[in-house]
């Protein structure tokens, strides 16, 4: 599963600009340092709302990060496929028995810079236990796990 290297379309650049405007308009400010080298997994939890994506794009743009994220294959169907890829999406077909852990380890090995965001719950709903693929990818690729947070009260 080699990821496509894409030049973002005018649509995706426009959507990023709009989401960035919305992020700032809501009063959000990003703080922190991005680890170097820029090869790591970002743990995004809890993932509870579709709004998480809007704030995620604003946060990463504010920090100058172009991360990738894993999302279910259904989000990559026409007409959304190119847009999702432009936004950094990595399609994951959960109905197939593919080894996405190894595919992501291989992707990290090919790139000097690759930041992958994973919601360890694997869904927006509440779960009792996280999936462990993020850990196995990090160990196999010998990269750090980065934990960030969004303080909704202080923005």
Which residues make up each language-model segment?
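Soluble catalytic domains of membrane acyltransferases
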Residues: 3-8, 25-155
